[in-house]
Amino acid sequence: MSTPNALAAFNSSPSLNAPEGITNPPIDDLLEQVSSKYALVIYSAKRARQINDYYAQLGEGLLEYVGPLVEPGPREKPLSIALREIHAGVLEHTEGE
C-alpha cells in the first residue's frame, strides 16, 4: 500500500554513508604503491596478520609486533588498517618479501 506521500518521504530520506574498507582508499591509488594487484593482496594480508597478532599479544604483555601506524577507527578491521597504511605510504615494501 504505497501513497505518493510515502514515496516522497522515501526519496527524500538521507542516503546511507559511503562504504568503507576496500573502497576507501580506492584500489587504483593502492596499486600505485605496488607492482601488481597480486603483490597488493600479499602485502596487505601480511600486514593485516601482523596487526591482528599485535592486538592478540597485548593481553599477554608481549611486544613482538608493531601496532597500527595510522589511527584506527572504532572496530576497524586489520585489513582496512593495513590498506590505509599502504595508501599513506608509512610502510616500505620490497618485492618478494
Swiss-Prot record:
Domain of life of the native organism: Bacteria
Keywords in alphabetical order: DNA-directed RNA polymerase, Nucleotidyltransferase, Transcription, Transferase
GO cellular component: DNA-directed RNA polymerase complex
Listed EC numbers: 2.7.7.6
InterPro entries named among the record's database cross-references: DNA-dir_RNA_pol_omega, Pol_omega/Rpo6/RPB6, RPB6/omega-like_sf
Molecular function via GO: DNA binding; DNA-directed RNA polymerase activity
Reaction catalyzed: RNA(n) + a ribonucleoside 5'-triphosphate = RNA(n+1) + diphosphate
Compositionally biased tracts (Polar residues): 1-16
Gene Ontology process terms (BP): DNA-templated transcription
Region (Disordered): 1-21
UniProt subunit comment: The RNAP catalytic core consists of 2 alpha, 1 beta, 1 beta' and 1 omega subunit. When a sigma factor is associated with the core the holoenzyme is formed, which can initiate transcription.
Classification via PANTHER family: DNA-DIRECTED RNA POLYMERASE SUBUNIT OMEGA (PTHR34476:SF1)
Role summary: Promotes RNA polymerase assembly. Latches the N- and C-terminal regions of the beta' subunit thereby facilitating its interaction with the beta and alpha subunits.
UniProt similarity note: Belongs to the RNA polymerase subunit omega family.
Protein name per its UniProtKB record: DNA-directed RNA polymerase subunit omega
Gene: rpoZ
